[in-house]
């Protein structure tokens, strides 16, 4: 495992962490709701920067290999209607 520190941003501003809690329905069991959680500090994706934004009807999570050159590893979009809560931890001075 590498010790590269990833930068976490919320709407482009550096923060300590972002946690998004949301729910999903099971495909074969629509009555079953599964609570999911995205935690930027615990996410295993190796990247330089992860930027979380609420844009229109989605929470957009973008993983950058190189943010200054806009080289994106991948994006995830979570519909806002399934989001239960978003926690943003600011950087400590």
Model-identified regions with their sequence ranges:
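Anionic N-terminal interaction surfaces
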Residues: 1-53
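Short acidic DE-rich linear segments
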Residues: 2, 91-93
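N-terminal functional modules and adjacent low-complexity/disordered segments of proteins
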Residues: 3-5, 33, 58, 76, ...
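Serine/threonine-rich low-complexity intrinsically disordered regions
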Residues: 21, 62, 74-76, 84
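Short, flexible beta-strand-to-coil junctions
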Residues: 23-27, 64-68, 88-91
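Acidic, low-complexity, intrinsically disordered interaction modules
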Residues: 38-74
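Structured surface patches comprising rigid loops and adjacent beta-strands/short helices at the edges
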Residues: 52, 76-91
């Amino acid at each position: 495992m590498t010790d590269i520190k990833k930068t976490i941003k919320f709407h482009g501003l550096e923060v300590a962490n972002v946690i998004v809690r949301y729910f999903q329905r099971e495909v074969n069991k629509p009555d079953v709701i599964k609570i999911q959680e995205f935690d930027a500090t615990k996410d295993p994706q190796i990247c330089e920067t992860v930027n979380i934004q609420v844009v229109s009807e989605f929470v957009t999570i973008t993983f950058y290999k190189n943010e200054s050159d806009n080289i994106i590893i991948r994006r995830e979009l979570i519909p806002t209607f399934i989001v239960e809560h978003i926690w943003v931890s600011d950087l400590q001075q």
